[in-house]
Structure formats: structure tokens, C-alpha cells
Curated annotation (Swiss-Prot):
Species of provenance: Macaca fascicularis
Record keywords: Cell cycle, Cell division, Cell membrane, Cytoplasm, Cytoskeleton, GTP-binding, Lipoprotein, Magnesium, Membrane, Metal-binding, Myristate, Nucleotide-binding, Palmitate, Transducer
Region (G3 motif): 197-206
Topology in membrane: Lipid-anchor
Region (G2 motif): 174-182
Lipid-substituted positions (N-myristoyl glycine): 2
Name of the protein this chain belongs to: Guanine nucleotide-binding protein G(i) subunit alpha-2
Family under the similarity heading: Belongs to the G-alpha family. G(i/o/t/z) subfamily.
Lipid modification (S-palmitoyl cysteine), residues: 3
MF terms in GO: G protein-coupled receptor binding; G-protein beta/gamma-subunit complex binding; GTP binding; GTPase activity; metal ion binding
Subcellular location, record wording: Cytoplasm; Cytoplasm, Cytoskeleton, Microtubule organizing center, Centrosome; Cell membrane; Membrane
């Protein structure tokens, strides 16, 4: 009888050991799994960050994949010049050369078919080149804060000669600059520093926000993107609302949400390159009338940083990790993401009682 009991005890002890081992392994596996939620208003650079993860932590974009972006590059280029030409009418800006009016008519006549077919024919690229060189068009481009224009407009239009070549294959940088509105949730997986990342990019336009909700559970960290350069712009979906104010409103609701009490919040103040360019001629008082500092990058950027960090109502227990970023600069994103990962590792160890 004694032997039987001890054999059963032994088996039970083995089972218990196995369960403990499995639980420990599951715990370690869970600690290595990182769920990152990318949040922010529309056009703040979230999708560009996702593309950078593909370049930095995966194999980037193959030639075949880059080829597939040709139609998007063409569409972004055509849409940009059309937006500028349309705005000339609203802003009452004339072409410097009156014959450009014919080119404008040609642009609207040719663009629809070109976009549908995903091509940039010679006659259309010639029309775009002549329009972009016109001083009136350039004057209108200089006033782009008064209408909706893609950030990548000048990047593509200045490089039209290369883009219009018949054998054109987009570069990684061309791909990074493409703009396609994110609808729904885009999930990306990659491994870095022994951690398995699941990154969720969520559409930033207001109509998309209700889809975020079920992504929130069990999130390790939130990366909140803000377009620094949007301080003098209004929303595409609400012409009354300043984009920076909208961003602050959204950040406030995320940062102080009861669901995220234990979630690391990482703030990416993005598009620092565009902000640095813009701040010298477009004052920060457009967005913050109370601002009395200089319209210089360092001072103005610090002011915006403090405006966001001051929204944190739990400063004693919750830290905001802020980084200034340029999402189209791979080296910058690589450096910043390295620092972000260290914060995540440190916080994970804290949660496990190992730090």
C-alpha cells in the first residue's frame, strides 16, 4: 500500500513540476512578447514608422515590392500638383506664365486615366514639370498651410525627372514618403533584442478611432505620434480644428485613460525636419497665442513638448518618454527605437520584480 501511495505522490509531484515549468516558460514567453500600439491623429507619421520597422528589423522592401509602389508614387505626385493648382483659384494666385493655364487644363484631363492605370505618361509628366517650374505655382506652394497638401509633395515634384523614367523603380526612401490613408488596423510582427514585437498601426482620422478599442487590451506600450509641423494646419476632416490642438486632445484622452494606468506612454514628436524649416516663417503663436518665446527650433519644440507632457495628470506615478523624430530618416528612427526598446525591457523587468 505504502509503495502505491508513494508512486502516486511521485507522479503528482512530477505533474506539479511540469505545470510549474510550463507556467514559467509561458510567463517568460509572455514577458518577451511586446504589444505596441501606434496612436496619433491623421498624417502624424504612424505608417511611416511601421515601414521603418520593416526596413530596420525585417529585410526591407525587395525590388519587386518597391515596384508595387510605383502607382502610389505617381498618384501622390499627381494629387499634389492638382491640389496646388486647385488652391491657386481659391487663393487668387495667377500663373506667372499665362500659357500654363493650358497645362492646368491638360493636367485635369489626363490625370484621371493615369491614376486609374497607375502610370505617368510622358505628356502628363511634361505638363507637371512645366507647372511645377512656374513662379505662380511656387508661390501657391509656399502658402500650403492654407490648404491640404501632402508632406511629400516637394520631394516627388523636385525629383520628377527620375520618377518619370520608363524604367523607374521606387527607392526605399520613395516608399517611405508614400501616403496612403490607413483604414482599419495594420499589424506588423518583428523580433529585436530577444523581444517579439506586435505593432498595431491604427487609422488616425476621426472616423477610424472607434475601431481602436479592442486593440487596447494587454498592450505593453503606446507610441503616440504627433506631427510637430502641423501646428499651423487644420484637419482634413474638420477645417475649424487646428491639428496640434486635436492631437493634444487625443493625447490627453489616451494618457489619462484608466485602461492605461500601467502602460508605458512613448511620445514621438515627429516631422522635426519640416518643423525646423517652417518655424522660421510661420510663428508658433498661430497655434499657441500665449507663446512668447523665439520662433527658433529648440525653444519652440521644447514648448510643444511641455504642452503635451503637462497633460499628464499622474506625473508622480506615470512617466512620458518623449523623443523628437523624423520618421523618414531611417538612422534617426533606428536610434530612437533602440532607446524605446530599452525602456520596454526595463519596465518588463520591473513588472516581473527583477529590477
Amino acid at each position: 500500500m505504502g509503495c502505491t501511495v508513494s508512486a502516486e505522490d511521485k507522479a503528482a509531484a512530477e505533474r506539479s513540476k511540469m505545470i510549474d515549468k510550463n507556467l514559467r516558460e509561458d510567463g517568460e514567453k509572455a514577458a518577451r512578447e511586446v504589444k505596441l500600439l501606434l496612436l496619433g491623429a491623421g498624417e502624424s507619421g504612424k505608417s511611416t514608422i511601421v515601414k521603418q520597422m520593416k526596413i530596420i528589423h525585417e529585410d526591407g522592401y525587395s525590388e519587386e515590392k518597391c515596384r508595387q509602389y510605383r502607382a502610389v508614387v505617381y498618384s501622390n505626385t499627381i494629387q499634389s500638383i492638382m491640389a496646388i493648382v486647385k488652391a491657386m483659384g481659391n487663393l487668387q494666385i495667377d500663373f506667372a506664365d499665362p500659357s500654363r493655364a493650358d497645362d492646368a487644363r491638360q493636367l485635369f484631363a489626363l490625370s484621371c486615366t493615369a491614376e486609374e492605370q497607375g502610370v505617368l505618361p510622358d505628356d502628363l509628366s511634361g505638363v507637371i514639370r512645366r507647372l511645377w517650374a512656374d513662379h505662380g505655382v511656387q508661390a501657391c506652394f509656399g502658402r500650403s498651410r492654407e490648404y491640404q497638401l501632402n508632406d511629400s509633395a516637394a520631394y516627388y515634384l523636385n525629383d520628377l525627372e527620375r520618377i518619370a523614367q520608363s524604367d523607374y523603380i521606387p527607392t526605399q526612401q520613395d516608399v517611405l514618403r508614400t501616403r496612403v490613408k490607413t483604414t482599419g488596423i495594420v499589424e506588423t510582427h518583428f523580433t529585436f533584442k530577444d523581444l517579439h514585437f506586435k505593432m498595431f498601426d491604427v487609422g488616425g482620422q476621426r472616423s477610424e478611432r472607434k475601431k481602436w478599442i479592442h486593440c487596447f487590451e494587454g498592450v505593453t506600450a503606446i507610441i503616440f505620434c504627433v506631427a510637430l509641423s502641423a501646428y499651423d494646419l487644420v484637419l482634413a476632416e474638420d477645417e475649424e480644428m487646428n491639428r496640434m490642438h486635436e492631437s493634444m486632445k487625443l493625447f490627453d484622452s489616451i494618457c489619462n485613460n484608466k485602461w492605461f494606468t500601467d502602460t508605458s506612454i512613448i511620445l514621438f514628436l515627429n516631422k522635426k525636419d519640416l518643423f525646423e524649416e517652417k518655424i522660421t516663417h510661420s510663428p508658433l503663436t498661430i497655434c499657441f497665442p500665449e507663446y512668447t518665446g523665439a520662433n527658433k527650433y529648440d525653444e519652440a519644440a521644447s514648448y510643444i513638448q511641455s504642452k503635451f507632457e503637462d497633460l499628464n495628470k499622474r506625473k508622480d506615478t506615470k512617466e512620458i518618454y518623449t523623443h523628437f523624430t523624423c520618421a523618414t530618416d531611417t538612422k534617426n528612427v533606428q536610434f530612437v527605437f533602440d532607446a524605446v526598446t530599452d525602456v520596454i525591457i526595463k519596465n518588463n523587468l520591473k513588472d516581473c520584480g527583477l529590477f
